[in-house]
Amino acid sequence: MERIKELRNLMSQSRTREILTKTTVDHMAIIKKYTSGRQEKNPSLRMKWMMAMKYPITADKRITEMIPERNEQGQTLWSKMNDAGSDRVMVSPLAVTWWNRNGPVTSTVHYPKIYKTYFEKVERLKHGTFGPVHFRNQVKIRRRVDINPGHADLSAKEAQDVIMEVVFPNEVGARILTSESQLTITKEKKEELQNCKISPLMVAYMLERELVRKTRFLPVAGGTSSVYIEVLHLTQGTCWEQMYTPGGEVRNDDVDQSLIIAARNIVRRAAVSADPLASLLEMCHSTQIGGTRMVDILRQNPTEEQAVDICKAAMGLRISSSFSFGGFTFKRTSGSSVKREEEVLTGNLQTLKIKVHEGYEEFTMVGKRATAILRKATRRLIQLIVSGRDEQSIVEAIVVAMVFSQEDCMIKAVRGDLNFVNRANQRLNPMHQLLRHFQKDAKVLFQNWGIEPIDNVMGMIGILPDMTSSTEMSMRGVRVSKMGVDEYSNAERVVVSIDRFLRVRDQRGNVLLSPEEVSETQGTEKLTITYSSSMMWEINGPESVLVNTYQWIIRNWETVKIQWSQNPTMLYNKMEFEPFQSLVPKAIRGQYSGFVRTLFQQMRDVLGTFDTTQIIKLLPFAAAPPKQSRMQFSSLTVNVRGSGMRILVRGNSPVFNYNKTTKRLTVLGKDAGTLTEDPDEGTAGVESAVLRGFLILGKEDRRYGPALSINELSNLAKGEKANVLIGQGDVVLVMKRKRDSSILTDSQTATKRIRMAIN
């Protein structure tokens, strides 16, 4: 009332009325800002003056039954007045304190499970180590980074279905959980969250954090894996950086890292096989990373790296529309060009056919350690602005841009012949020939490029052919900048096509990627990569090829044996024997193969010489194209452990050792498996081979006359039965087979049946 009187008093003075009515309100915008709309314009001020009131909080009426009207100190906790405009009660902040101290306690068992990502973050920070702070200029570039450590890689839709199924299992709505990961996660979470009292909405939010990759486009200098991004605000400022080592790793970073390594290995291997595309697909489908199928990871994981993108393209997935050259990702930001074939002469007068891009174009170039902006016209570099972590990185970027520009002075700077080949010994295309040449040595290129005087532009500096910086002169069109160039932020994915040589093109036919662009960097994967394809056996060197080849034969012995007998050529051509050939000295491969094939043919022809162990041991040698020669060998050489080691044609050696008693095969001391059937090389071996073509029916049956010797057996007619004397004077009943096709199985079953018949 006092205030109203005061205002009336003020209004009665003419001066007040005049000020309020005559003064122009020229800041209408400000008045509007603070008076229109439901959005609070100054939340902190609002909070402050609300909290200065006695009852700033509203609560459900039921609270009055759960909280006393006054606390121990006699302070009122809630007002008897209703909140205007709703049927809630006005509550004092002291009520919150009372509730926290005296309110009901629920079980906390679910908290670490629901807030798993937070608990894990605390652990990582607790065990992380922060090093010294350095003050220096930070070259940050915006990159798309993963801001959410410890997540699975489900798509938003897949995650939504999982969350609905876990949090609101009885809600209506079609939910189809199809992928392996969806089903596993749903089962796991349902078990974890039984009797959970935390609000379903909160649970849903937290599950989303755990299931979906969240990315942001952030300025980063340094590590980009999610465990570094979560502390970005602590590790880099505008002019300082703090060293930090994370206190733990998270699966999503490990998956990204291992995926890149697997993809690189697979692309490199596929590139040298007879049908690269088919091989690549076969390997992607048969590889597991950390126990998950690689193809499933490729479908969900947004990692953009050359090899990964080639694998995705092969699977028909969309990839980024940027293209790769010299390890840099190029994104055209303006302009356009048409392609035309042109013949050019190198400094060595070698003719190159290059596809010239005619027209003005601008690109951003982003590499691991350097970035640049490139403006070019037809076969002319107009401007290149580079920034990089160190001199070496800047040189790499300049070389790539100069080659990409296709300028004549670059082509004329070639000294010597260009004859670089890829892993499959095929010549590289001309642009990659030039690139390799100058990556080896760029001296002549920089010397021939030409220099120009430069203007003083803030943040830019000149660079001379010897890589020293200057404020007066610079290589023509080239400047070094303190600022990085941001990665292209648009995450659009386009439909691409891939040819059998793994060249990936967009729909206009521009080559985006090729195996030449796949990095040669070797790393050690964080998660176990299991390559089931025989093409990847050589990844761990010659020993692994040897062991894997013999393991494969033993695992598939049943089918191998039948093919050995009935269709040897098909067996020799199996791709599983391909890697083995690289271990056999080139000069002698053909002779070995001819020798072994002849030996095998004799085994098939001459009864009594079928010898399982020997077949297994020599089989891989028969896979090479055979040379006919009369040469006999008592041992065959394989190149392992840096030298030639011998495999004895008859008997054991350190390379191939079969233990008759344990039936175990060791190759170079490594276990290569157990033979399930018994290749006993004594009498049984001979007998089983001799009894090929005969079915052993059981013990001696006197009705079929006296026991014949093994040699007399050949006189039996098909279907005729007879007793036969074998080995140690035992007699068994046999019948000559009516069909020849089943002959092979006899030699396996004979041994077992003889034993049964005798015992």
Swiss-Prot record:
GO terms for molecular function: RNA binding; RNA-directed RNA polymerase activity. GO terms for cellular component: host cell mitochondrion; host cell nucleus; virion component. Gene3D superfamilies: Polymerase Basic Protein 2, C-terminal domain. It holds the Pfam family Flu_PB2_7th. It comes from the Viruses. Keywords: Cap snatching, Eukaryotic host gene expression shutoff by virus, Eukaryotic host transcription shutoff by virus, Host gene expression shutoff by virus, Host mitochondrion, Host nucleus, Host-virus interaction, Inhibition of host innate immune response by virus, Inhibition of host MAVS by virus, Inhibition of host RLR pathway by virus, Inhibition of host RNA polymerase II by virus, mRNA capping, mRNA processing, Viral immunoevasion, Viral transcription, Virion. Its main location: virion. Signal peptide: none annotated. It is found in: Virion; Host nucleus; Host mitochondrion. GO terms for biological process: 7-methylguanosine mRNA capping; cap snatching; DNA-templated transcription; symbiont-mediated suppression of host cytoplasmic pattern recognition receptor signaling pathway via inhibition of MAVS activity; symbiont-mediated suppression of host gene expression; symbiont-mediated suppression of host mRNA transcription via inhibition of RNA polymerase II activity; viral RNA genome replication. SUPFAM superfamilies: PB2 C-terminal domain-like. A motif (Nuclear localization signal) lies at residues 736-739. The record marks K627 as: Mammalian adaptation. Influenza RNA polymerase is composed of three subunits: PB1, PB2 and PA. Interacts (via N-terminus) with PB1 (via C-terminus). Interacts with nucleoprotein NP (via N-terminus). Interacts (via N-terminus) with host MAVS (via N-terminus); this interaction inhibits host innate immune response. Plays an essential role in transcription initiation and cap-stealing mechanism, in which cellular capped pre-mRNAs are used to generate primers for viral transcription. Recognizes and binds the 7-methylguanosine-containing cap of the target pre-RNA which is subsequently cleaved after 10-13 nucleotides by the viral protein PA. Plays a role in the initiation of the viral genome replication and modulates the activity of the ribonucleoprotein (RNP) complex. Belongs to the influenza viruses PB2 family. This is Polymerase basic protein 2. It comes from Influenza A virus (strain A/USSR/90/1977 H1N1). The lineage of its organism: Viruses, Riboviria, Orthornavirae, Negarnaviricota, Polyploviricotina.
